[in-house]
Amino acid sequence: MSGAGSQNTRECEMKTTEQKRELSPHQALLLEMLKDLDAACRKHAIRYQLFAGTALGAVRHRGFIPWDDDLDVILLRSEYDRFFEEAAPELDPERYYVQREGGSHWPMQFSKLRRNNTACMEKYHPKDPCIHQGVYIDIFPCDNLSDAPAMRQLQFAAAKVVIAKALYARGYETDSMAKKLFMQLCRPLPRGPLERLCMRKEDTASQMVHTFFAAGKKYEKNVFPRSWLEESMDMPFEDGTFPVSAHYDALLTRLYGDYHRLPAPEERKCKEHAAILDLEHSYVEHLEEQKNMTFEVHTRSIR
């Protein structure tokens, strides 16, 4: 099946905290993937958390936000590195592809767990024909933030440059002239030193951490006390139980404000990340279709 826009709209039925509903096929597959990721992390005592809209869904809906079609997890950089060294090898390579940041076919500064033999192809034309485009879970690193205010702002700015360079390399398409110009201006800048500045791997005692590589627009929505990522609690999510921040109220308030309040009915729409969604066939079978697609509306996501 292709043309995810109309399919996602049909599948995104409303649910409240008290009401039960049937998951869309896409959400059901994401939940299955999350369970496998969770089992691998628990086996190796790797600390991760549901993050962003997925954490909001856990708290407010005890599962997916009904009109959402993605799944996000986050780890402190040290745990993130351990995930790839210890947990990722536990995942069945016949079913999963681990798309790690810095890989030969993935220029972004976060990673994805992809499901083989599926397609979740977004609204752009990849420059790299070998990029895996299966259904995915986003895996975000959380990095050390300097204790010096001026250096923090420098880290934020450096992350914007790194992201712009990565988006250009990936083939990101936008109708924003400002974004196009910024990506072009960033192209000659060195990526390695900027990445190291953003990560500050040696600064493991910093009081604050950041998610600048998740590409949030506002500085204050991407910086958190380290304890928010170190301290977790299990919370029901659909028919499973998964870790969220023990400080979820403060975290979600920072991200969303009054997160308990549901959006107006007209705003409860699927994000429609995918231009082509196929849960039964590989993205490889849709490459020619993707090549010939034109996009009237570009995704605002970096994913």
Descriptions of predicted regions:
Residues 38-71, 80-81, 227, 255:
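Active-site nucleotide-donor binding segment shared across nucleotidyl transfer reactions
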Residues 74-76:
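Short hydrophobic/aromatic beta-strand micro-patches
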Residues 18-42, 87-147, 167-173, 183-255, ...:
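Conserved catalytic core of two-metal-ion nucleotidyltransferases
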Residues 148-154:
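A short secondary-structure junction signal
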Residues 1-13:
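Short, Lys/Arg-enriched N-terminal segments with co-localized hydrophobic residues
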Residues 47-48, 72, 234, 241:
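Beta-sheet entry/capping signal
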